[in-house]
A protein has these predicted regions:
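An amphipathic, aromatic/His-enriched active-site/gating alpha helix that lines ligand/cofactor pockets
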Residues: 24, 28-38, 55-90
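Residue-level preference for beta-strand/loop junctions
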Residues: 2, 33, 46-48
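Short, surface-exposed ligand-recognition loops at beta-strand->loop->(often short) alpha-helix junctions
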Residues: 9-20
Length: 99
């Protein structure tokens, strides 16, 4: 499995907008039901920091891509304008997990 973690800080006056766009991504994912990855997003307690985690599954023959989801494309298109601290993506190693 390949994991990617993306961290950034939204502008305080655009954090709710950012969350709304993320919620549209999840609505689109729910409607499309793509296969081959797990996607989680966290809004941290400071209200402006977000962490996205994408885990690509190895056991899917023809995995779908988050990049192909229209709502995700719309989310990514304006991310720079919504951020005080630009997104930083890093590969991550899964050490363990529970449920």
């Amino acid at each position: 499995m390949k994991a990617t973690v993306v961290r950034y800080q939204a502008k305080a006056d655009r954090a709710d907008e950012n969350q709304g766009l993320i919620e549209k991504v999840f609505a689109d994912l729910e409607a499309r039901q793509p296969d081959g990855f797990t996607y989680k997003v966290f809004r941290l307690a400071d209200g402006v920091s977000f962490v996205h985690v994408v885990i690509e599954h190895d056991d899917v023959a023809n995995p779908d891509s988050l990049q192909d989801v229209p709502a995700f494309q719309a989310f990514v298109a304006g991310i720079a304008d919504r951020c005080d601290v630009a997104p930083l993506a890093m590969g991550a190693t899964i050490v363990g997990g529970y449920r």
